[in-house]
Amino acid sequence: MSNRRLFLKSIPIMAAAGAVGMAGLARAANPMVAETDPQAAALGYKADTTKVDQAKYPKHAPDQHCGNCALYQGGTAAQGGCPLFAGKDVANKGWCSAWAKKA
């Protein structure tokens, strides 16, 4: 088999590998949402669930955190995406008033 034919056959594999690699780079580029961000402040977001004001958010429970919220898109990672904060990551151990138990 010629080198050219071998090269042409490998293009789809290289393209797929490149796409997967680029997806990882794009994912890693998301900044963390700041607690002072207007959307975060409106939802009472805290990067550490233990720092939530119980008087202000009486429905908050110590075992509630972004990592076990239905909206969290980070799996078991220390930070991950949340549709409420487009383009920004939240802390796995964070919390906001939109917390909803994972099914």
Swiss-Prot record:
Q: Which UniProt keywords apply?
A: 4Fe-4S, Electron transport, Iron, Iron-sulfur, Metal-binding, Periplasm, Signal, Transport
Q: Which GO terms describe its biological process?
A: aerobic electron transport chain
Show the Pfam families listed in the entry. HIPIP
Where is the protein localized?
Periplasm
Q: Which family does it belong to?
A: Belongs to the high-potential iron-sulfur protein (HiPIP) family.
Cystine bridges: none
Q: What this chain does, per the record?
A: Specific class of high-redox-potential 4Fe-4S ferredoxins. Functions in anaerobic electron transport in most purple and in some other photosynthetic bacteria and in at least one genus (Paracoccus) of halophilic, denitrifying bacteria.
Point out the signal peptide segment.
Answer: 1-28
- GO CC: one term? periplasmic space
Q: How does it assemble?
A: Homodimer.
> Record keywords: Signal included?
yes
The protein's matches in Gene3D superfamilies, at most eight in alphabetical order, are given as: High potential iron-sulphur protein (4.10.490.10)
Lineage, top-rank taxon, reads: Bacteria
Q: Which GO terms describe its molecular function?
A: 4 iron, 4 sulfur cluster binding; electron transfer activity; metal ion binding
Source organism per UniProt: Ralstonia nicotianae (strain ATCC BAA-1114 / GMI1000)
At which positions is [4Fe-4S] cluster bound? C66, C69, C82, C96
- Does the keyword Disulfide bond feature in the UniProt annotation? no
Indicate what this protein is called per its UniProt record: High-potential iron-sulfur protein
Which InterPro entries does the record cross-reference, listed alphabetically?
A: High_potential_FeS_prot (IPR000170), HIPIP_sf (IPR036369), TAT_signal (IPR006311)
